[in-house]
A protein has these predicted regions:
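Nudix hydrolase/Nudix homology domain
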Residues: 99-165
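A sequence-level detector of short linear motifs
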Residues: 13-16, 44, 148
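Conserved Nudix-box catalytic region and its N-terminal flanking loop in Nudix hydrolases
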Residues: 21-32, 37-77, 81
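Acidic, metal-coordinating catalytic segment for phosphate/diphosphate chemistry
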Residues: 1-33
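A short coil-to-beta-strand element that immediately follows conserved catalytic motifs
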Residues: 86-95
Length: 165
């Protein structure tokens, strides 16, 4: 299990370092959601059927920020681990954040052309990937094919996209 830095709700770092998942009241870790956008389509990933939480459902890339790591570094590490992608700083845009029960989630957008044959899935995390339009993803949400906690992250992404189009 990885260690994480602990923050208060205002994102001020506390002196504590804990094992992920072992947070006390009013303690938060940082997580990243990484949306991969190629032109007007999203690359999404299907969670491994071996996952304890939401097996087989679809979501964006991402994960927890480990102790000593920045949110941006976590974006690069998670996309490398889960999908075998080397993401460059200039391809990454910070969109915003929101707070859940035990973590603060940073939302990031990576815009580039992805080659499916260059993507290497981390089997224990990711079962499959696919490229979908926003309309197709909305339909997947409606059909409950997507991790149910994704809405705040996805809504921030859509708001950002609407501003830049």
């Amino acid at each position: 299990m990885e260690n994480v830095d602990i923050f208060n709700k205002r994102r001020e770092k506390l002196e504590n370092i804990r094992e992920r998942g072992k947070l006390e009241k009013n303690e938060y870790s940082i997580s990243v959601h990484v949306w991969l956008l190629e032109e007007d389509k999203l690359w999404i990933q299907q969670r491994s059927n071996e996952k304890k939480i939401f097996p087989g459902l679809w979501e964006q890339s991402g994960g927890g920020v480990i102790s000593g790591e920045t949110s941006l570094e976590a974006v690069k590490r998670e996309t490398k681990e889960e999908l075998g992608l080397d993401i460059q700083d200039e391809e990454i845009t910070y969109i915003g954040s929101y707070t859940r029960v035990t973590d603060i989630v940073d939302i990031w957008l990576v815009q580039r052309i992805f080659s499916k044959d260059k993507i290497i899935l981390q089997d224990e995390e990711v079962a499959n990937i696919k490229n979908v339009t926003f309309e197709e993803f909305d339909k997947m949400i409606e059909n409950k094919e997507v991790v149910p906690t994704i809405n705040p992250s996805y809504n921030l992404l859509k708001e950002y996209i609407e501003k830049i189009v």
